[in-house]
């Protein structure tokens, strides 16, 4: 019979003198905790979407959840879970969105220059709804602005960003996790070489790189 694993402390980073800077609490292995973590993200998305919809605030689910939603339409076994809940909305609607989300229990904060809504006053930054502003660049050096919320589709309980717009966002950001999300879309056939002709040249080149060298 398997023996329970006793929680323990593990030293984390150390300074140059070898002194521990932090400790990490390690609990037992648990599939239930994994399932619970995924469900928390799902419920956070649904609560936020319901609050925005009830307040008539235009929005669209973006980010990793949008990728997962599109992937699931083709192959649910290829879905990659994400801890982020990203919502695309217009900056002029932030005030209305703030009132709506706070009424649903979220707490507005500025974190690293971003607008986030923590899932309660004691929530961690990971346990939050992250706002992505439509028609604006996330970072000044990026080649394209985000799409408008009108580029979205009704998914029943929420609106999700359209595939074309999602791909443009991911190619514009092009961080490691964005490339991973693009590979997921490529692997199941939602994105292929036919996309190159309809994309702005600067991000079409990025897609070409991924198509020619997926592991690069």
State the predicted function of each range.
Residues 2-216:
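Compositionally biased terminal segments of proteins
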């Amino acid at each position: 019979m398997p023996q329970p694993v006793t929680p323990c402390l593990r030293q984390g980073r150390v300074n140059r003198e070898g002194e521990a800077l932090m400790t990490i609490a390690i609990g037992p292995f648990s599939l239930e905790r994994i399932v619970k973590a995924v469900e928390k993200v799902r419920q956070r998305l649904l609560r936020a979407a319901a609050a925005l919809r009830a307040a008539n605030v235009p929005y669209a689910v973006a980010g990793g959840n949008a990728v997962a939603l599109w992937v699931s339409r083709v192959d649910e076994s290829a879905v990659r879970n994400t801890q982020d809940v990203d919502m695309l909305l217009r900056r002029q609607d932030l005030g209305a969105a703030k009132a709506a989300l706070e009424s649903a229990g979220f707490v507005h904060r500025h974190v690293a220059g971003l607008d986030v809504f923590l899932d309660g006053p004691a929530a961690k930054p990971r346990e939050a709804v992250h706002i992505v502003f439509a028609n604006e660049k996330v970072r000044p050096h990026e080649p394209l602005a985000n799409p408008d919320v009108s580029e979205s589709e009704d998914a029943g309980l929420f609106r999700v960003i359209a595939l074309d717009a999602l791909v443009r966002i991911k190619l514009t950001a092009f961080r490691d996790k964005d490339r991973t999300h693009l590979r997921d879309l490529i692997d199941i056939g939602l994105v292929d070489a036919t996309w190159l002709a309809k994309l702005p040249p600067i991000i079409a080149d990025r897609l070409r790189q991924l198509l020619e060298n997926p592991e690069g």
